[in-house]
């Protein structure tokens, strides 16, 4: 993180005020506090501890190193807020089982207000009636197994189209394919089709979608940058906007919202026309479904129906277009670097499905090794290595330590899922470990929670797994892979809160099936 001079000046100006607020909250607890990492300053805490020190690894890796030194439960301060980091089975279980309701709130972040529809997006909303109603609507009506089943042919058709596009890029035995870019295009096009019924293809889509893609990338950057208000939540840092973040967020939000507003208006007009004619119309997409289920008074909490729909659409795009593509990208890179596992997966598909047709979703249940691969990739590279931060609404106890109200929780899932006490050879890619190990994704096995656990677990898990299994199955079945240099792909991870590879997956591919199948 880089801290501008003007930000530091503003920080120093209000040091004494913050110090007063900080010390006023301090009360001696009945139980011991967790270990706190050294090096913190009065008031600002450990803000500079994670500054640009030449270590460009993901934050989860850095916090994992601190866990090795200070234990699986420790704290530090980012300005005023106290941050609790947990990475052991016992501590994770305490947080998401014993104290699940207590830790169900979300901390306030500036991007949630200016980019997240004033925290109307489900993953940003505080635990309460709005969150419960919205989550129920999404799980039962939008992302339920029965609803996703109706979109099965959409997923298959989109993946097939993308596979054919990939096939057309093959030029002899020396053409290099950027698989990372291909996966991003596939997942973005798929979720846009399912949400808004639009057919998007890079370079051929409408101008609105292209503008949204740029704004979406800006959102990802802005949501991960250090913002003074997040560490010192007083109105001054919104009004003065030392770092220029508020201005940038407002500009980016305007571009994002204009696209969603246009999609929404198109669907409202279509719905009105259908009601006039008295027919059901064409197949419903996600916006159609939400419009039919949500009245203007349905959710309340100060949000309009249109705001909630747009916030819900944004949440779905965020999870599906970025997170799913990121995970499949890591999975394919691991398989390309582990050709024995790739060949074993290909042999399983050849045996169970054959080479005369493509894998379908109904085949996945029989592809045991493929399922193990997906689980192993999620173990090594969880979509949210620290999950989305939680915040406790009252004092509680975690692993015998007193945790005061208002503490922000970082659950280091990446560290947990590579714990040598829980996993043999934890850093090794070994899908076989899940063949004999009966473990699922639902968050009740506290050594393995790639989609989180408890009330705030990811509602898009079923969709993500469907797309990941089917996409990887097609890529495994359809092609052989090698790197341009015949050396393993670089798996180096970039800085930030996600596990994003620094270098894209660039490979040379050759088809495995008959030409007429592509």
UniProtKB/Swiss-Prot annotation:
Transmembrane helix listed as a keyword: yes
GO biological process, one term: alkaloid metabolic process
Record: residues binding heme: 458
SUPFAM superfamilies xrefs: Cytochrome P450
PROSITE patterns for the chain: CYTOCHROME_P450
Tissue expression from the record: Expressed at low levels in green leaves.
InterPro entries: Cyt_P450 (IPR001128), Cyt_P450_CS (IPR017972), Cyt_P450_E_grp-I (IPR002401), Cyt_P450_sf (IPR036396), Plant_Cytochrome_P450_Monoox (IPR050651)
GO molecular function: heme binding; iron ion binding; monooxygenase activity; oxidoreductase activity, acting on paired donors, with incorporation or reduction of molecular oxygen
EC assignment: 1.14.14.-
Similarity comment text for this entry: Belongs to the cytochrome P450 family. CYP82E2 subfamily.
Function: No nicotine N-demethylase activity.
Protein name, UniProt field: Cytochrome P450 82E3
Phylogenetic placement of the source organism: Eukaryota, Viridiplantae, Streptophyta, Embryophyta, Tracheophyta
